[in-house]
């Protein structure tokens, strides 16, 4: 269902990445997470932001079913939620983990509406990466566009 629950520590901010398939994981999620970790390492100890990286895989007809195993092998997330558990997470997020009061949901693959729903449910900000079209701009806090 999920990974890393016992290893999680109390963090002040959650960075939740929404994604769906193998292409999005390797071309978008992995580099974005690497950048977050570079930023975290570059700050001196007094300035470090205490955040947790979490990955939520969402239902997708193009998924291979191995996305969880691939993301888990990177050892970059404190929590990974499988796509088959997405609806349970959306309905009862606190049954999966403790969620910091502050956070951000970043859409990097799947249906953009999933990130809108999860961000609203958790009370977090939402950033949608839109390669071509942002489908829910009225409910998105920020849009990151390719062009």
Show which residues each predicted segment covers.
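Active-site and donor-binding regions of nucleotide-sugar-utilizing enzymes
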Residues: 17, 21-22, 26-147
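N-terminal amphipathic/basic-hydrophobic helices that include classical n-h-c signal peptides
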Residues: 1-7
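Extreme N-terminal starter segment of soluble prokaryotic enzymes
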Residues: 10-15
